[in-house]
Amino acid sequence: MVLAVLIGVLVGIVLVSSLLLRWNEVRYSRKQGLPPGTMGWPLFGETTEFLKQGPSFMKARRLRYGSLFRTHILGCPTVVCMDPELNRQMLQQGEGRGFVPGYPQSMLDILGRNNIAAVHGPLHRAMRGSMLALVRPASIRSSLLPKIDAFMRSHLHGWAGDLVDIQDKTKEMALLSALRQIAGITAGPLSDALKTELYTLVLGTISLPINLPGTSYYQGFQARKKLVSMLEKMIAERRSSGLVHNDMLDALLSGNDGTRERLSDEQIIDLIITLIYSGYETMSTTSMMAVKYLSDHPKALEELRKEHFDIRKGKSPEEAIDYNDFKSMTFTRAVIFETLRLATVVNGLLRKTTQDVEMNGYVIPKGWRIYVYTREINYDPCLYPDPMTFNPWRWLEKNMESHPHFMLFGGGGRMCPGKEVGTAEIATFLHYFVTRYRWEEEGTNTILKFPRVEAPNGLHIRVQNY
């Protein structure tokens, strides 16, 4: 009797599961002209498979359905595009063709609806203008690079003789460097409090928007609330004190130079959170993976050291590097770009359709997301011969940055505005790291590359003076 009931329950579960899956397919298949694909479960879609399998999920569906297929991930019906030319066109055409940013609800809620990656139209132009003014070449030369140099010189002091988790060190480095440039915050109780909340916030941005205690989304959203409160207090103190700090927050609060629209406090806070988030993610991961790749490729490390010791010739030990030094770091730039490419620090970009859009004979309905999946472009042997090999020299052979399918920093009118200052930060880190130290990896260090690049148990190196 018990066995019969158990079998009945199991059969019932199978039938209900099959009906739910079938209902979700029929629900979306009513729309005419959709690309092929599957939609998974109601609400959850195929999010679990996507986050667990990552690139394997994408490759399997491309083999089955082609370079344009439909799925349901992160709470949204989504079309994945793995075609390099279609991706280039989407990024170039942007809003004029019906494509606006389409980041998942979790990211919108946690980074803020005014974050520069999510807004479009006049607000995006205003926020992008404000950000570009902060990171233009003149600002890097006169203000940002001197601060970056002083910070890196201090942060990398005294590592010799230690067993260092370079993942932790680069995370701390990226966050503290961003806080110093944006709001003049140095290491101390305030930076520690901000660091705790920012680490939690980052984990919540790629999650299902389920607002229940214990979920990554809930924790990330609570962290955002605390960060907003801290930043509101900081802004109020700046205004009441009247002191000049000569940092990014000062520039944003002081209004404009007559050419830009003034941002509200809410917009400034969302911009600051996004600046810290994007810089932290990209800079920390790229710096860590550059150390890893250089460890594994001694010839590249030797070439990099030569470039940086040549720069130090004629400088006193405490003399800072300047903008001309940074612009002369051609091999360093190649190492950074090759690290971004091979590690795939950014897997792709999300867009949303504002109207029905025709693409390769299919119709993408209004309101759907399009995942501009650029990861496989990084491994295309037609663009990058022997693509799985770390080869910085490939970036010196021709001007790869002008290649139409160069998408390491996005594309079109949404090319990452912080590209140069981010490159300057990583280049300065490498300058002091390779001229001061030699290192060896210790233990077994596992690297995961999806949904974000990380070393789950750390990346440990034994550091000695050079």
Swiss-Prot record:
GO terms under cellular component: membrane
Question: Keywords on this record?
Answer: Heme, Iron, Membrane, Metal-binding, Monooxygenase, Oxidoreductase, Transmembrane, Transmembrane helix
Alphabetically, which GO biological process terms does the record hold? Answer: brassinosteroid biosynthetic process; brassinosteroid homeostasis; microtubule bundle formation; skotomorphogenesis
The record ties this protein, via InterPro entries, to: Cyt_P450, Cyt_P450_CS, Cyt_P450_E_grp-I, Cyt_P450_sf
Concerning PROSITE patterns, the annotation shows: CYTOCHROME_P450 (PS00086)
Give me the residues that bind heme, please. Answer: 416
Membrane topology for this entry? Single-pass membrane protein
* Entry GO MF terms: heme binding; iron ion binding; monooxygenase activity; oxidoreductase activity, acting on paired donors, with incorporation or reduction of molecular oxygen
Q: Give the reaction(s) catalysed.
A: 6-deoxoteasterone + reduced [NADPH--hemoprotein reductase] + O2 = 6alpha-hydroxyteasterone + oxidized [NADPH--hemoprotein reductase] + H2O + H(+); 6alpha-hydroxytyphasterol + reduced [NADPH--hemoprotein reductase] + O2 = teasterone + oxidized [NADPH--hemoprotein reductase] + 2 H2O + H(+); 3-dehydro-6-deoxoteasterone + reduced [NADPH--hemoprotein reductase] + O2 = 3-dehydro-6alpha-hydroxyteasterone + oxidized [NADPH--hemoprotein reductase] + H2O + H(+); 3-dehydro-6alpha-hydroxyteasterone + reduced [NADPH--hemoprotein reductase] + O2 = 3-dehydroteasterone + oxidized [NADPH--hemoprotein reductase] + 2 H2O + H(+)
Q: What cofactor(s) does the depicted protein rely on?
A: heme
Keyword Heme assigned to the entry: answer is yes
TM region positions = 1-21
Function, as annotated: Involved in reduction steps of the biosynthesis of plant campesterol-derivative steroids, ending to castasterone (CS) but missing brassinolide (BL). Catalyzes the C6-oxidation step in brassinosteroids biosynthesis; the conversion of 6-deoxoteasterone (6-deoxoTE) to teasterone (TE), 3-dehydro-6-deoxoteasterone (6-deoxo3DT, 6-deoxo-3-DHT) to 3-dehydroteasterone (3DT, 3-DHT), 6-deoxotyphasterol (6-deoxoTY) to typhasterol (TY) and of 6-deoxocastasterone (6-deoxoCS) to castasterone (CS).
Q: What's this protein's name?
A: Cytochrome P450 85A1
